[in-house]
Amino acid sequence: MHEHSLFAPVPAAQHHDLLQQLAGVTAMQPNRIYERRLVFKPYRKPGYLKPRPGGSQDVQAPEVQRLNKMLNGGLYHVQVVGEVKLTDFGTHPSTVDATMGGTDFGNQHQNEYDISNQSWRIEFKDIPDAGTGSAVTSRLISTSRVPYGDIVPVMKAWGYDYVSEYVLEGDMFILDDTVILLHRILNFPAKHHLQGLPAFYLPPLQEMVPLDSTGGYLLQASITVQDSGNPDLMKATTQRLLGLKEHLKSAVRLESADRLSLDTRVK
């Protein structure tokens, strides 16, 4: 698959007005999303990855083939993404609540965030194509679902070490085949960092630290093309994104991104 994208920085003061404009353009209300994103890097050379028996036993055969191709092709960072809810933030494991003397244990257990029930998908995104002369950013991408629960041993079996994690917070709109995402990156507070492991639970949302200290957001408009070998389809996709750019030019300036700023290769 190929992803074609345009990007625009959005100051915090413009966030609300742009949400309203995007709602009008797409004729839909914003779909609020929260994603927990774990970053992994390979510790083995390309072509050497051999999953341990049982490491991917819950993944069906087509997914195993896709994973093999995705994770065995080169030294690239990959992200493991889990969708979470607003109510997942600030909930502790029940064992912690019990230790702290919580009196409403039943309700705590029902509503708490449990990483063992977290579903995941692996996202691979290549460095954007070079020398295309295109007005949009284009790059090869691939995604695959993986088992629930503790993802670190699964990724270890594929030859990947955990590096870091963050939360993507934003609003999504759909316009025909274009996904429009107005979002920002939130880092975990220092006290929630574990050596070599993701956090066991999500801190309160208000304790998360914006990557952009000014509170700014990033607007990304993307179209994913399944048949990247079809030049007419690729051209039509570019034209649709440029049409959206023209439509929104009074509010934001959508542009292609600097290629090296999206470099996912392991240095």
Curated annotation (Swiss-Prot):
Q: Looking at the UniProt record for this protein, which Gene Ontology cellular component terms does it annotate, in alphabetical order? A: core mediator complex; mediator complex
Q: Which domain of life is it from?
A: Eukaryota
Question: Which keywords are on file for this protein?
Answer: Activator, Nucleus, Transcription, Transcription regulation
**InterPro entries recorded:** Mediator_Med18
Signal peptide start and end residues: none
What GO molecular function annotations does the UniProt record carry, in alphabetical order?
transcription coregulator activity
One of the protein's GO biological processes: termination of RNA polymerase II transcription
* Pfam families for this protein: Med18 (PF09637)
The entry's localization annotation reads:
Nucleus
- Ranges that cross the membrane: none
Member of which family? Belongs to the Mediator complex subunit 18 family.
Description of how the protein assembles with itself and partners: Component of the Mediator complex.
Q: What does this protein do?
A: Component of the Mediator complex, a coactivator involved in the regulated transcription of nearly all RNA polymerase II-dependent genes. Mediator functions as a bridge to convey information from gene-specific regulatory proteins to the basal RNA polymerase II transcription machinery. Mediator is recruited to promoters by direct interactions with regulatory proteins and serves as a scaffold for the assembly of a functional preinitiation complex with RNA polymerase II and the general transcription factors.
This one is known as Mediator of RNA polymerase II transcription subunit 18
